[in-house]
Amino acid sequence: MFARLCPVSETFGRLCPVSETFARLCPVSETFARLCPVSETFARLCPVSETFGRLCPVSEMFGRLSPVSETFGRLCPVSETFGRLCPVSEMFARLCPVSETFGRLSPVSEMFGRLCPVSEMFGRLCPVSEMFGRLCPVIT
């Protein structure tokens, strides 16, 4: 599903078994890595409109990461990890029926959770919290 958006072997790619799914988000090393100005990073995940975008009308939501303050945030108690990606505390959350896949990030161990030692990969992108927290100077 999230699979081969392109090659992010430098950032998202090393999420362990995720290296085959989230891994290829394009040159995300330049996009996802800079989740500060997310409006310019996550939004340009390539033709994400065909993969990431179709999480629902996510193509309209995920694509508009400018007002990220309405999506990334409420993934459950993710508000402490994924949620603090800036004012992202309200964006990632409403991916529609995504509440069944991405939305259950509480037991992340079922979906996004198996990023393995995410604390070593996803977590060290800057200091967002403890897991997704360090995505650059993403002012928490």
Swiss-Prot record:
Coiled-coil segments on the chain, per record: none
Name the source organism.
Homo sapiens (Human)
Name the UniProt key words of this record, in alphabetical order: Repeat
What is this protein's record name? Putative uncharacterized protein FLJ45035
Q: Show which residues constitute the signal peptide.
A: none
Tell whether Repeat is among the UniProt keywords: yes
User: Residues annotated as region 14 X 10 AA tandem repeats of [MT]-F-[AG]-R-L-[CS]-P-V-[SI]-[ET]?
Assistant: 1-140
Q: Where are the sequence repeats?
A: 1-10, 11-20, 21-30, 31-40, 41-50, 51-60, 61-70, 71-80, 81-90, 91-100, 101-110, 111-120, 121-130, 131-140
| Segments traversing the membrane | none
